[in-house]
């Protein structure tokens, strides 16, 4: 195997696919990141180019590898109370309008391994008193969802 550098054309293919699959827009500045994250997959399959890997994941026969590529190319940056101003806004402008006795529900999209939905849960527990509430967390990455389910 003699893997070549990620060409602009190949990068464009991954950019388009990731945008269509996940709504994630990759700037040109992310080209090295894409190459670095996918290089081990080229080695794993003995492929010589990122274009060959793109064909492999897009041919419909390797949906498991398609998910691996998606997991590798999503950021998964997470920590508790990651965007403090969002939580301030929730406390100051949303929670005061919650209907007492009616379940207050929030969805944490792109919740990674769970820190964001847990942060929401702590905020709701503190701010809603006896009003019932629920938080749903989801993510496009099966790898981080498995981590969240395991409690890590």
Residue spans of the language-model regions?
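Conserved AdoMet
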Residues: 1-107
């Amino acid at each position: 195997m003699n893997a070549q550098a990620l060409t602009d054309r190949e990068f464009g293919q991954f950019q388009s696919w990731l945008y269509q699959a996940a709504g994630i827009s990759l700037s040109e500045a992310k080209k090295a990141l894409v190459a670095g994250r996918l290089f081990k997959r080229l080695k794993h399959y003995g492929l010589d180019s990122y274009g060959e890997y793109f064909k492999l994941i897009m041919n419909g026969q390797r949906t498991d590898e398609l998910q691996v590529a998606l997991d590798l190319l999503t950021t998964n940056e997470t920590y508790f109370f990651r965007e403090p101003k969002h939580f301030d806004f929730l406390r100051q402008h949303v929670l005061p309008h919650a209907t007492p006795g009616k379940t207050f529900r929030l969805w944490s999209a792109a919740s990674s391994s769970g820190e964001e939905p847990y942060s929401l849960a702590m905020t709701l527990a503190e701010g809603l008193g006896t009003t019932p509430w629920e938080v749903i967390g989801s993510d496009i990455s099966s790898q981080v969802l498995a981590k969240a389910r395991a409690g890590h």
